[in-house]
Amino acid sequence: MSLTGFIGLGNMGGHMARNLIKNGKKLIVYDVNKAVVQEFKAEGCEVAAHPADIAAASKEIITVLPSSPHVKAVYQGEAGIFKTIQPGTLCMDSSTIDQIVSLEVAQAAALLKAEYIDAPISGGVTGAQQATLTFMVGAGNDATFKRAEAVLSLMGKNIVNLGAVGNGTAAKICNNMLLGIQMVAVAETMNLGISMGLDAKALAGIVNTSSGRCWSSDTYNPVPGVIENIPSCRGYAGGFGTTLMAKDLSLAQNASTNTQAPTPMGSLAHQIYRILARDPQYQAKDFGVVYQFLKKQNS
């Protein structure tokens, strides 16, 4: 059986990789966290010492990495994928990064007669666990999209073809900016209502059956006790961290500057999450902890 390469076994990537295993894929994996790598080795996966080892062993590679510098290092570093990549290899990158980096890596892959597509994801840790993720794919052509879809559909349920390489990243940046704005809005709405004497569950129920309904309210409410089995009910542990949200909002602000498209609400959300990402109380917490931050501002 041919090997599928998987690089990045964190909160999202780990679950995604396991869904590939459940669907019969044989993996060769790499992550800087050696303890996690050993877990996958115990589950029957082959282990690579460097990303280059994965490229030498596989013509189908998935990467899920934290930021643009990580993507550059994994693909173009001294022991990176491009050192040993085989012609015809398809690289599917589900990282959330600057659009320009996606385009640069794609161009470098093409020079090596390989393909790089951006396929960022939405759906959170739960979506990664349950294989219900949405993939926003910039594949460049239909043939490449169909090849990628056969793999991505094992990890998600909505595989969306957005056309040119870079478009997936653009869509993800826009989506996550909206998510950050929504979470701040839901947190301040809940804080205001509770401060006015409303029961948290009752207020959430009204919002979720009215025009204010959104994912941050009806699925991922930041107030502890409103929804079970999400980070706000376990001290904001796990989930999508404040540092990652600050990073994604920074990407949106970079795009806003480059395109001269105004994003005033995105800018405000970015300022708030930059504060949280720098504060030891909040920096290791899920981004819903913005509710606790706002609550502490009550006079």
Curated annotation (Swiss-Prot):
Enzyme class, first EC level, given as a word: oxidoreductase
The intrachain disulfides are: none
Domain of life from the UniProt record: Eukaryota
Binding-site positions, NAD(+): 2-30, 96, 247
Give the keywords, sorted.
Branched-chain amino acid catabolism, Mitochondrion, NAD, Oxidoreductase
Pathway membership of this protein? Amino-acid degradation; L-valine degradation
Provide the protein name.
Probable 3-hydroxyisobutyrate dehydrogenase, mitochondrial
Species of provenance:
Caenorhabditis elegans
